[in-house]
Amino acid sequence: MALLQISEPGDSPAPHQRKLAVGIDLGTTNSLVAAVRSSVPEVLADAQGQVLLPSAVRYLDGGAVRIGREALLEQARDPLNTIVSVKRFMGRSAADALASGAPYEFVDAPGMVRLRTVQGDLSPVEVSAQILAVLRQRAEDVLGDDLVGAVITVPAYFDDAQRQATRDAARLAGLNVLRLLNEPTAAAIAYGLDQAAEGIYAVYDLGGGTFDISILRLTQGVFEVIATGGDTALGGDDFDSAIVAHACAGEDVAALPVADRRALLVAARAAREALTDQAQAPFEVTLRDGRAIQATLTRAQFEQLAEPLVGRTLESARRALRDAGLAVGDVRGVVMVGGATRMPVVRQQVGALFGTEPLTNLDPDQVVALGAALQANLLAGNRPPGEDWLLLDVIPLSLGLETMGGLVERIIPRNSTIPVARAQEFTTFKDGQTAMSVHVVQGERDLVSDCRSLARFELRGIPPMVAGAARIRVTFQVDADGLLSVTAREQSTGVEAAVAVKPSYGLSDDEIARMLADSVTQADSDARARMLREQQVEARQLVESVGAALAADGDLLDPAERATVDQRLQAAAQAQSLDDVEAVRAAVQALSDATEEFAARRMDRSIRAALAGRKLDELA
C-alpha cells in the first residue's frame, strides 16, 4: 500500500514546483555559480560554455564596466582600472591593502579601504557586487526564473568585517543571502553526500589568494568542523610572485611600472599552470622599455621555489590537528579544494604529510560551488525525503569581556560550534553604581591588554544598590554566519543595551596564529598575572568597603582598635600597586582579620535597628 503525504490546507506545494536557489563560490581568482538540477548539483555555464568567471572587473571612462575575461584582456595595459583578487581587500583597512603590495592606488576611508579608478573611488564591496551580479544573471538565464536566494562561500578564517562585507556585496548585486558558508565546509558537503564518507577528514583549500585547512568529523548525517586554520594572504598568486622573483633575479621588480609587473605575473601564472602537465615551461615578457625577460622554468626549479610556501600550508595543517587533539594517523583522507591544488608539488607534499593519496575525484575548482548549491537547495526547502543532515561550523578565537582589574572572562571558548549563544551574570563593583561599561574582546590570553578589542558599549539605568546586589545578564550570540551580537540586561528593571560587532577591519591569520601561540607560550606568566590582578581587585574592594564602613559606624571601635584597622587599611591600600601576589594576599588577610569583630558589631547594630519598636508577634 502506498503512503500518502498529507499537508495542511494551502500548504501543499504544487506538483514539480521548486524554489530556485544557487550556491556561489566568490573566489579570489575565479568565481562560479551552481544549482541542483534533477537532484544533482552542477556548475552553470555562460553563453560561451565557460563555467569559471575570472574575478576581475575593469572600469572604463564613460561608465562602462567589463567583467571576467573581457576585463583580463586589458589587465596588463590598464592595471590601475582592472581590479583582480579583490577578495583580499574585503573588510580590510588601507594599511592592510598597502602591505599586500597589490598594484593599485588605495584610498583610506572609514570602515574599509577604497580603490581609485577612472570611475571614482570604489570599495571592494562594490567591485565584488559586479561579479556577483553577473553570476546572478547567469543563473537566472540558465534556470529560467528569479532566484529566491543564494548560499555564498567565504574562507573559514574570514572575520566579522569580511563576512559582513560579503553580505553587503550580495545585497548590492540583488541577491538574498540564505547563508554564508565556509569554503572547506562546502567541500565537505559535496564529498560527504556523494560518497557517504564517515570519519575524520582534512579539507585542504588552496585557491588563488587564500588558504584554509579544516579538520572535520563526518558521521551519520552530521558534518562538524572541529578545528580550522589557514592564511588569508597565501595562494596561487604567491607562487606566481615567487616565479617572477626567480625569473627577474637582479631586477628591481617593485620599481617597474605597474603594467610591467602585471605582465610578469600573467606570464608566471601561465608557466605555473603549464608545469602541471609538462616538465618545463617558457617565461617570456617584453617590458615597456623594450627589454625582454626570457627564462625556461623546469618543474624541479619550480618545486624548489614552491617548497617554503607549501611548507607554510603544512604547518597550518599540523596546528589544526593539534587544536583538534588528533594525530596525522587519525585522518582518513584529505579533500583537495582550489585550483592551486592541481600543482603536483602540492599534492605530493600533502600526501606525504597525511600518508594517504589526496581525494581529487571532484573538480577542485568546482567542489566548493557544488557543496554550496546543495546547501542552498536545502535552505530553499527543496530537500527530498530522507535527505536530512546537519552542519556545524566553529569560531576560531574565544570571545569574552573585560572584568575588574583588566582580566578577561571568556564567554564563548574557541572552536565552539556555531550558531551558539552563551550568557553569564555579572554585578556592580561600587555602591550606587548606575552604569556599567561592557568591553567585548577576542583572544586566548588572560589579560585584556593581550587580547583584541572588538567593541565597547554602556548599560545605563541600573537601579542604585549596594555593590554586588545588581544582577546584569550578558548574552553573547554568534549566528550561522559567524557574526557576533552582545546584549546586557539588568534583571530587575529589564533595562537593556546591545551591540552588533562589525570590526572596522579584519584580523589576519598570521595574527590569529600568533595569538594562539602566545596563549601557549605565555600560559604560566598569564596565570601568575591573573592571580595578581585578582588579589589586587580583592584588595581594592575590601579597602573601599572598609572605608565606607568606618565612615558609617567607626564609633563602634575603641581608639586602639581604630588605630589597628587604620594601619592595616593603609597597608592594604598600598598593596594594591605591588607586583608580589603573596604580599597583596597577606595585606588583604591582615585587614580582614582586623575587621572581623568590627563586622560582627555592625551586624548587631543593624539587627537592633531593624527590630527597634517591633513587637514579638510581628516577627512571627
Swiss-Prot record:
Keywords: ATP-binding, Chaperone, Nucleotide-binding. PROSITE patterns: HSP70_1, HSP70_2, HSP70_3. InterPro entries: ATPase_NBD (IPR043129), Heat_shock_70_CS (IPR018181), HSP70_C_sf (IPR029048), HSP70_peptide-bd_sf (IPR029047), Hsp_70_fam (IPR013126), ISC_FeS_clus_asmbl_HscA (IPR010236). GO terms for molecular function: ATP binding; ATP hydrolysis activity; ATP-dependent protein folding chaperone; unfolded protein binding. GO terms for biological process: iron-sulfur cluster assembly. SUPFAM superfamilies: Actin-like ATPase domain, Heat shock protein 70kD (HSP70), C-terminal subdomain, Heat shock protein 70kD (HSP70), peptide-binding domain. It comes from the Bacteria. Belongs to the heat shock protein 70 family. Chaperone involved in the maturation of iron-sulfur cluster-containing proteins. Has a low intrinsic ATPase activity which is markedly stimulated by HscB. This is Chaperone protein HscA homolog.
